[in-house]
Every structure is written in C-alpha cells, then in structure tokens.
C-alpha cells in the first residue's frame, strides 16, 4: 500500500523577537490596520509613550527581511488596585500606560498582542 502524496511544506520563516524601536512605529501601525481592519490603530503618540514608560515591555516579531509580523505591549500593574470587572482602559491608563507601576506592581499585564493575519497558522 502506498502512502498518499504529501503537500510540500511551506518554507519556514525566520522570526526574531526584539524590543521596539521608534523606527518600528509605522510598521506597527500598518500591522494594527491589517490585524484590526476598521478599528483605529495605535497612534505614534501612544507607542512613543509606551517606550518612554516601559521600553523593556514592548516587543516586535521581525522576519529577516525586516518585515514586522507581530507586536506585544506590556506594562506592570499593582493587581491590588484593580477588580476583575475593570476594563482594558482601566488597566492600561486609557492605552497610554500612565499607570505602569514598577515599584509596587508585581503583575505583568499584556495590553496588546497581535500577529499579522497573513501568517497565522
């Protein structure tokens, strides 16, 4: 009995995760537009604020070509300041991360994770 022919595997992408740089902002905004069509993307002002407040918590997933295929944004919060019913806006200071609290906070809050819809598996 012969096995059915297998479809050749697509070439694997080499993706590297690194911290966000200001030069990434246009690509992050474009990624946001592809990921959430019709919704307002992150603004350069908000992305810049995230970098000012907590650069170690902002990441991009980049292909060797330089194309950005993923983005993650985090901040540290003091969980005791929040209730489970609080909104994303409450946890993120309206998306500006003004409530980032590296002194009293012990919880890394994932405010955003997006992956380009063209490469999702």
Where are these regions (language model features)?
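Short acidic N-proximal helix/loop "leader" segments that mark the beginning
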Residues: 1-12, 91-94
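Glycine-rich phosphate/pyrophosphate-binding loop shared by adenosine-nucleotide-utilizing enzymes
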Residues: 13-15, 66-71, 108
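A short beta-loop-alpha structural element at the N-terminal edge
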Residues: 14-28
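Helix-loop element at the rim of GNAT/NAT acetyltransferase active sites that forms part
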Residues: 30-43
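Short loop/turn motifs at secondary-structure junctions and domain boundaries
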Residues: 49-55
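Conserved beta-hairpin
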Residues: 57-72, 85-88, 118
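Conserved acyl-donor/pantetheine-binding loop and adjacent beta-alpha core of acyl/acetyltransferases
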Residues: 72-114
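Glycine-rich acyl-CoA binding loop
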Residues: 112, 120-121
